Amino acid sequence: QTQDDKRWNIYEVNLDGTGFKPLVENDEPDLEFYDGTYLPDGRVIAISNIGYQGVPCVNGSDAVGNMVLYDPKDKSMRRLTFDQDANWNPVIMNNGRVMYTRWEYTDLTHYYSRIVMHMNPDGTENKALYGSGAMFPNSTFDVQPLPGHGSAFVGIISGHHGVARSGRMIIFDPTKGRKSTAGMVQEIPHRNRPIKEEIKDQLVNGVWPQFIKPTPLNDKYFLVAAKLDPHALWGLYLVDVYDNVTCLMQAEGEGYISPILVRKTKTPPSIPDRVKLNEKEATFFIQDIYEGEGLKGIPRGTVKSLRLHAYEYAYVKTRSDHNWHGIQSGWDIKRMLGTVPVEEDGSVIFKAPANTPISIQPLDKDGVAIQWMRSWVTGQPGEVVSCIGCHEDQNQIAIPKRVIASQKAPSALTLPEGGTRSFTFDLEVQPILDRACIACHNGEGKAFDLRGGKKDKLGYGTSYLNLHPYVHRQGGEGDMVVLQPYEYHPNTSELVRLLKKGHHNVKLTDKEWKTLYNWIDYNAPDKGYFNANVLTDLPYKGFDQIKRRKELTDKYANGAG
């Protein structure tokens, strides 16, 4: 922080302290930059507050950072990630890709969901590297590739509430497994102690030694900041896979972290850009949606289409907790994009908006979601995003077979009737109640009131508050592990069972049933908006958040605002 408005920026300085200068030069008065890393081609990846997002579980009081790609030669910049919560610590892997930590909890438990991702430097092929679909570890921070190794990396596993950034030092190898302890090769300094899965929010409270910011010297020796016991100082240590822990630097009244090795290293390969910035869409290809644990046991031919929605994330210092969008409905707005067909052999190909966090739900013939993605995929402009199936193992190779979708042009989205919009109870569900229910549920007599209009101090209508208890759903804090297919089928909801059994001769149309299923599949939300205010504190002072988010997205994300 060197500017009067106390914004963070990334600076470059020579080892002797001379030549101090900003590495990222951008004229926007409200943007901050941190966690910078050099790319092999001279460009820089950094984290920025460019999304005007706040951490939803604390009502946006903490800003969220997403990644940008910056070119010092011409000062051009492009946004790379469109993630719900924070990105941390991007670093170049030995193969030229970028790995980083992503915090996500769209319908997931928010204190077990900081996972390791990897992508190309231009943002393409962004996918999970370690920890997706598992409760352990809660968080993996400070990841660094092991020199000369094709896949292994070191990281710090930690909890969420309680001790949140330092923790246990683990060597990972994703080729051995990508969940829980499957790919954990060794804990330092406990080489002979098996690593056991422990599902606990405050994962490393009372655990010693505590480590933070490891730097590999090779695949066996590491520099790291450590605090060996509750009474020790934070110092710099040389540690190794043989359980040696040697103090290099420690001083009373000081704390040393972030050791950086000064040496000449081999530059990783430079991966050419694959984006086509003249395009507004990405192509998505699924080879066989029945592959993978997501649809395990589902008979072929069951999936008829995919329902797509985009996420609209919480704003800075804006109400966004569990009691905003609905009762146990999640943190984010779900914006309906439309549906696309699935071929008879389970293959799919379609086009959808680029630079947009998209979530997918496979639907059966009745329009019911068989599975929930509970995450998102973001295609870059002109990118072909491909996967083998539904939550398949990332170590699985493509199936050597020709599929129908690969021989066809991509399908266009079939838009929702009325166009793309946020799913809102008043617009989608209330009209069904008005037609079929309020003759009896009119606020008179014993039948509870299902009329719209009246709102309480949180903005909830009487009809929503009376109806949602009859919907069975996982809520906004669902299990990290992949759900069982049909685990939250609408038939498990008392509302649906009552209507199908027969309720005073109430009959819904096919369209109304699909709308009701959609509501249940989205976790029964109420509101489809945020009350984002103009902020009064720096660096956001004076900006209308909703307008500013759109402006920055249009300018730095290829017009995707």
Predicted regions and their residues:
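Short, conserved, GDST-rich strand-edge loop motifs in beta-rich repeat architectures
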Residues: 1-8, 46-63, 100-114, 153-174, ...
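Beta-propeller blade signature
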Residues: 9-17, 61-74, 113-124, 167-178, ...
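Multi-bladed beta-propeller domains
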Residues: 15-32, 70-85, 120-139, 176-206, ...
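Conserved beta-propeller blade repeats
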Residues: 29-43, 84-99, 133-153, 160, ...
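Loop/turn-rich, solvent-exposed surfaces of beta-rich toroidal or solenoidal domains
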Residues: 101, 145-238
